[in-house]
Design a protein with these regions (language model features):
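Short acidic capping loops at alpha-helix termini that bridge into adjacent secondary structure
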Residues: 8, 40-44
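A short, hydrophobic coiled-coil helix within the histidine kinase transmitter core
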Residues: 29-33
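Short helix/loop segment immediately N-terminal to the Walker
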Residues: 1-7
C-alpha cells in the first residue's frame, strides 16, 4: 500500500478454509503477512463459508475472534445456499454477509428472489453487517440490488476478475493516467 496505487478504502478479500482456521499458527501467519506487505489489518477481509461454521469448532471461533481483535474483517461467504442456522448470524463475528449468486441471478424476474434477498439484506443490516452480492452480471441486477439496499457488489457488471499480478499492473496504470490528467 506504500506505492500509492490504491485508495485507503481498498480492501483485500481472501477465502480461508476450516483447516486453515484450525491451525494454531494461523493468526501469527496472517500478522506476519500483513507486516511483510505493509497492509493494515483493517484492509483485510477473510471470507468463510457457511460450511465452515457448520463444523461448530471452538478452535475456529477462537481464531476468528483473535483475528477480529487484530482489526481483520470477516465475511460469511455464499450465504443463503447452505444449511447453516440463522443463529450463526448472531454468533459469527462477521462484518459482511456475502449473498450467494444463485439468489442474485433471478432478482427482478417474475417469481424471482427479490423478497428473499430483501429480507436477508434487512436481517444483515439489523445485525450491523454490510451485504456483498455475488455474481452481479446485468445492469438490471445491479439497479435492483441498489434498490433493495445492498451495500457492495461483485461480478462481471462491476469488474472482471483478474490475477494478482495483472491487478497490480491495472492499478499502476490507473494511477499514472490520473496523474497525467492532473
Amino acid at each position: 500500500m506504500d506505492e500509492g496505487i490504491v485508495e485507503r478504502s481498498f480492501m483485500v478479500h481472501v477465502n480461508v478454509s476450516t483447516r486453515q482456521l484450525s491451525e494454531a499458527a494461523f493468526v501469527e501467519r496472517v500478522m506476519g503477512t500483513l507486516r511483510e506487505t505493509n497492509v493494515d489489518a483493517a484492509h483485510l477481509t477473510l471470507e468463510i463459508t457457511e460450511k465452515t461454521m457448520l463444523n461448530d469448532n471452538p478452535a475456529v471461533m477462537r481464531t476468528l475472534n483473535a483475528l477480529k481483535r487484530l482489526g481483520v474483517k470477516l465475511a460469511l461467504d455464499d450465504f443463503g445456499t447452505g444449511y447453516a442456522s440463522l443463529s450463526y448470524l448472531r454468533d459469527f463475528p462477521a462484518d459482511y454477509l456475502k449473498l450467494d449468486g444463485t439468489l442474485v441471478r433471478d432478482i427482478g424476474q417474475h417469481g424471482g428472489d427479490d423478497p428473499i434477498v430483501r429480507s436477508i439484506i434487512q436481517l444483515a443490516h439489523s445485525l450491523n453487517m454490510s451485504v456483498i452480492a455475488e455474481w452481479v452480471s446485468t445492469e438490471d441486477q445491479k439497479q435492483r440490488l441498489k434498490l433493495l439496499g445492498c451495500d457492495f457488489m461483485q461480478g462481471n457488471k462491476v469488474a472482471e476478475a483478474v490475477e494478482a499480478d495483472a491487478l497490480g499492473v491495472q492499478l499502476r496504470s490507473r494511477t499514472s493516467s490520473v496523474e497525467e490528467r492532473n
